[in-house]
């Protein structure tokens, strides 16, 4: 779609940061209320509190229908491990089914089982909350023009661990790997046709872009301020270090700490998903739409194979610690994140690397 105490201290949201400066197009216009409807079942009621219709993009939000990170779950002050998926969605050519159209004062409900994406086998009291931002389009349109913030109530639940453990994990499946390529541990047996060559090229390009970005993070304070919202220490060396870690992981000389699949074997390649990561397993899966992207985009902030791979590698705790989340997609949303969130946002790294490569 999921952590360490540092992320908990930062109050990392599931989708986009709640501490974004208010503007006419991004103030709070929806209310989210969480309610327990079973041992580990949650019902989220999303209400449009404004006076105009909202067209809400579901990707990586409380309304996402896939096993993504919708809420933060805490037990005894620590985050409960997230076992779901962190996808990168294709943000161009959006279609109406990716949106929820919500009229003024209207509500929509979305239910999900926490035990399908979290390890709740310990049982006991947990605290659940959600906050973030939803990209918005005009009514009956699919072009993103703004965003709206939300923050839910804090919900306390007493979970039966045995019942929770009996819930099937949404992203469970066979962990067998087959033939492994040294570079980022590519499972070559998962590749068909030219896919292995395409992925190897993407990893090579991701390494090259990451090394250039690492250098720029140290030497180009204006770009750091543009994307990471600060050029102060410790952000510059931290950003550079993370880029170098991605570069090492994606280079041909790496022994590989992640396992990379050319194709999906866990059912996570839903419509709109380019690739996804299971951070609890340090596994990355490409989807069919990944292979429709250009190897490298010649458009500033455009999506491509190299930066999608870079994006996904930042989701893996074996590469980046604490690993990055999906707190903001696209240049406008990334630009709205404060420094504490930008450093933890996967798309910040892919957009920065793209900007350095193209001289944006």
Swiss-Prot record:
One Pfam assignment: Peptidase_M35
Principal location listed in the UniProt entry: secreted
Glycosylation sites: 205
Protein's cellular compartments: Secreted
SUPFAM superfamilies in UniProt: Metalloproteases ('zincins'), catalytic domain
EC class of the enzyme, as a word: hydrolase
Entry's EC annotation: 3.4.24.39
PROSITE patterns reported in the protein's UniProt record: ZINC_PROTEASE
One GO cellular component, as annotated: extracellular region
GO BP terms: proteolysis
Cofactor(s) the protein needs: Zn(2+)
Disulfide bonds: 191-262, 269-287, 300-360
Annotated signal sequence range: 1-17
Residue numbers annotated as active site: 312
Keyword Hydrolase among record annotations: yes
Positions annotated as propeptide: 18-183
Function per UniProt: Probable secreted metalloprotease that shows high activities on basic nuclear substrates such as histone and protamine. May be involved in virulence.
Protein name: Probable neutral protease 2 homolog A
């Amino acid at each position: 779609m999921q952590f360490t105490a540092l992320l908990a201290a930062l109050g990392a949201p599931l989708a986009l940061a709640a501490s974004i400066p208010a503007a006419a197009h991004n103030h709070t216009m929806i209310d989210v209320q969480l309610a327990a409807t079973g041992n580990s079942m949650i019902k989220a009621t999303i209400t449009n509190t404004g006076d105009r219709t909202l067209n809400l993009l579901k990707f990586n939000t409380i309304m996402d229908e896939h096993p993504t990170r919708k809420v933060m779950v805490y037990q005894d002050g620590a985050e409960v491990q997230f076992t779901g998926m962190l996808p990168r969605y294709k943000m161009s050519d959006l279609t109406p089914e990716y949106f929820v159209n919500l009229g003024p004062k209207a509500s929509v409900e979305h239910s999900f089982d926490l035990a399908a994406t979290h390890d709740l086998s310990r049982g006991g009291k947990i605290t659940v909350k959600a906050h973030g931002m939803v990209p918005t389009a005009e009514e009956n349109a699919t072009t993103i023009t703004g965003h709206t913030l939300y923050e839910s109530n804090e919900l306390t639940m007493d979970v039966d661990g045995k019942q929770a453990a009996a819930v099937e994990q949404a992203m469970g499946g066979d962990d067998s790997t087959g033939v492994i390529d040294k570079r980022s541990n590519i499972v070559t047996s998962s590749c068909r046709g030219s896919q292995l060559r395409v992925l190897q090229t993407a990893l090579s390009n991701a390494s090259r872009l990451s090394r250039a970005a690492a250098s720029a993070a140290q030497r180009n304070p204006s770009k750091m301020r543009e994307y990471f919202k600060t050029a102060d220490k410790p952000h510059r060396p931290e950003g550079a270090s993370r880029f170098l870690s991605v570069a090492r992981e994606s280079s041909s000389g790496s022994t590989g700490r992640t396992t990379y699949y050319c194709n999906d074997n866990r059912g996570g390649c839903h419509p709109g998903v380019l690739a996804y990561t299971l951070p609890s397993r340090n596994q990355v899966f490409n989807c069919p739409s990944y292979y429709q992207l250009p190897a490298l985009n010649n458009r500033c902030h455009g999506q491509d194979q190299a930066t999608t791979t870079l994006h996904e590698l930042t989701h893996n705790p074996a590469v980046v610690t604490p690993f990055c989340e999906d707190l903001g997609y696209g240049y406008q949303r990334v630009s709205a994140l404060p420094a504490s969130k930008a450093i933890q946002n996967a798309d910040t790294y892919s957009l920065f690397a793209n900007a350095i490569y193209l001289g944006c």
